[in-house]
From Swiss-Prot:
Taxonomic lineage: Archaea, Methanobacteriati, Methanobacteriota, Stenosarchaea group, Methanomicrobia
Family named by the database record: Belongs to the TiaS family.
Compartmental location: Cytoplasm
Cited function: ATP-dependent agmatine transferase that catalyzes the formation of 2-agmatinylcytidine (agm2C) at the wobble position (C34) of tRNA(Ile2), converting the codon specificity from AUG to AUA.
Keywords noted in UniProt: ATP-binding, Cytoplasm, Ligase, Nucleotide-binding, tRNA processing
The protein's name: tRNA(Ile2) 2-agmatinylcytidine synthetase TiaS
Keyword check for Ligase: yes
Gene Ontology molecular function: ATP binding; ligase activity, forming carbon-nitrogen bonds
Reaction(s) the record says it catalyses: cytidine(34) in tRNA(Ile2) + agmatine + ATP + H2O = 2-agmatinylcytidine(34) in tRNA(Ile2) + AMP + 2 phosphate + 2 H(+)
Domain of life per record: Archaea
Amino acid sequence: MRFYKIISFMLLGLDDTDSPDGMCTTYLGALIANELKRRGFTVTNHRLVRLNPNVIWKTRGNAGISLEISGGDSTVVFEIACEFVERFARFECEKTNPGVVVVESPPDPAFYYQALQRFCTIEETVKRLERIGALYKGYKNGRGLIGALAAVSSVLPDKTYECLAYRKNEVLGTPRIYAEEGFFTSEEQTAPHTWDTVDFIRREIVCVPHGKDPVLYGIRGDTPKWAIKATGFLETEEPAFSQIWETNQGTDAHLLPLPDGGPIEGESYRFSGVVESLPITNRGGHVQFTILSNGMEIPVFAFEPTKYFRNAVRELVVGDEITICGSFQKGVLHLEKFRPNLLATQKSRSSPRCPICGGRMTSAGKDKGYKCRECSGKVRDVPDQERTLQTKWYEVPPGSRRHLAKPAVRMKDDI
């Protein structure tokens, strides 16, 4: 006879079950949650945890999930989770290496922060799992154990929510059916409490994926109430079901202060400095400048996929004091957003208008100011050029934003 222990609290972690060609770890997690409820367990929280976006071996968005569960035996939960992983995970993909973890108390959050802001190895993850007495199983090389342990170790001082709607099995792999206008109406009616639903400037839908995964759409918001309200304006194919996930998305949780020794490959930072070189546009449309911070010169790039964001970057001039956020990869900082703190004075590059007759003036000679050909009026000083940048956050378009990056609508108090 088998005896079961009724546990009042446990956490299930899951990661790395998807692939670029299909499946989604949140979908599999939701299926497991539904099965657990069917078997009499109580699932009190569904959490989606984004990790270091610079990890090169991620399948897609580098996220793990955790479920908070009570009312049954942890061994049964573990067996159900493994059964679903073995049935649904995309093992044929080289990068798909699932991991399942069950613990009966929250592990030290230090591991979560390491996976979020730096890097973890499979070996150190397994050692931690052994040390805390977790139930765990890694498939193939077991890399998914990192995200699974990070998810159950996570703490969210700042949190957001995402309502994910999933497609029916019979339509998977076919084009998604939806009315575009409903998404624009949804954002108009619920912003700034929701974000990244659409890009109004480019007239693009952002929250609908284009791949073969089972997600129909994902609406992100400050609270479950706002995320659910936003879905009421949508006209889409009928989803199989929806699930609200508590997340660290849109929180800037991945950002670190700049180390004294300089930026480290694969880490993300927020820091202030002074623009050292005028932005230039490279071949391919990438905009580059240099920032000086703590005596270090750091190359900064706004890459072509950030589209109209580059226009704001081009307005920077030498001497501007700014705060920037971004990831350091391959020796350059990938700019996510910036805020001017103090704009430098810049002399106008064009000849001024005559203050008497309004005509265009010409140079009167080196250090002699300008003179008017029409009325002989003179001005001594070159006027300052009007700056268009404001003291506010400038950010990449919604379609280019990383999952963890905090949108400007959530930074109104960050001035």
